[in-house]
């Protein structure tokens, strides 16, 4: 029992710097329009307008290996909960012929032990955990990401 308590205390002590740095990092990433200094707690700041979804049904190229595909259509009112998954009305194995939608990956039918199931694995059931619709949102911060093809094409310059 004492060993467990000591182990838990050491684990918490080791994790504390990470937790604290996460708080400060989140604080530093706050939008610039948040008022600084004293302000009424009831002050409401309007939210930025939502980015427009790109719904042209064009399949987007992936930027890195194993990137989940983007959703090329609107899903605003799709019900995805324990009772219903609207995505499955088109993307389930049984429905793809009629809908012409791509079937979900066979990996979605495997449980955590790699066993193939007859239906979608519960851990893959909530599509929007990984798959997101594409929007015309502008980046909040600069992005220097380059995919492997652009790095290889750039030669030494891309190998930084």
From Swiss-Prot:
Residues 1-25 form the signal peptide. Keywords: Electron transport, Heme, Iron, Metal-binding, Periplasm, Signal, Transport. The keyword Nucleotide-binding does not apply. GO terms for cellular component: periplasmic space. InterPro entries: Multihaem_cyt_sf (IPR036280), NapB (IPR005591). Heme c 2 binds at residues 108, 127, 130-131. Binds 2 heme C groups per subunit. One of its GO terms (molecular function) is metal ion binding. Electron transfer subunit of the periplasmic nitrate reductase complex NapAB. Receives electrons from the membrane-anchored tetraheme c-type NapC protein and transfers these to NapA subunit, thus allowing electron flow between membrane and periplasm. Essential for periplasmic nitrate reduction with nitrate as the terminal electron acceptor. This is Periplasmic nitrate reductase, electron transfer subunit.
């Amino acid at each position: 029992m004492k060993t467990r308590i000591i182990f838990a205390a050491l684990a918490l002590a080791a994790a504390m710097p990470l937790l604290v740095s996460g708080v400060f990092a989140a604080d530093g990433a706050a939008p610039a329009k948040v008022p600084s200094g004293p302000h009424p707690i009831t002050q409401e700041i309007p939210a930025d307008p939502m980015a427009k979804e790109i719904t042209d049904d064009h399949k987007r190229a992936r930027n890195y290996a194993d990137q989940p595909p983007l959703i090329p259509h609107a899903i605003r009112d799709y019900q995805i909960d324990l009772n219903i998954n609207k995505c499955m009305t088109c993307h389930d194995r049984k429905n793809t012929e009629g809908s012409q939608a791509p079937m979900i990956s066979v990996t979605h039918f495997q449980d955590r032990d790699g066993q193939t199931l007859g239906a979608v694995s519960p851990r893959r059931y909530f599509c929007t955990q990984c798959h997101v619709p594409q929007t015309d949102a502008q980046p909040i911060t600069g992005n220097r990401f380059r995919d492997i093809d652009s790095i290889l094409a750039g030669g030494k310059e891309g190998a930084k």
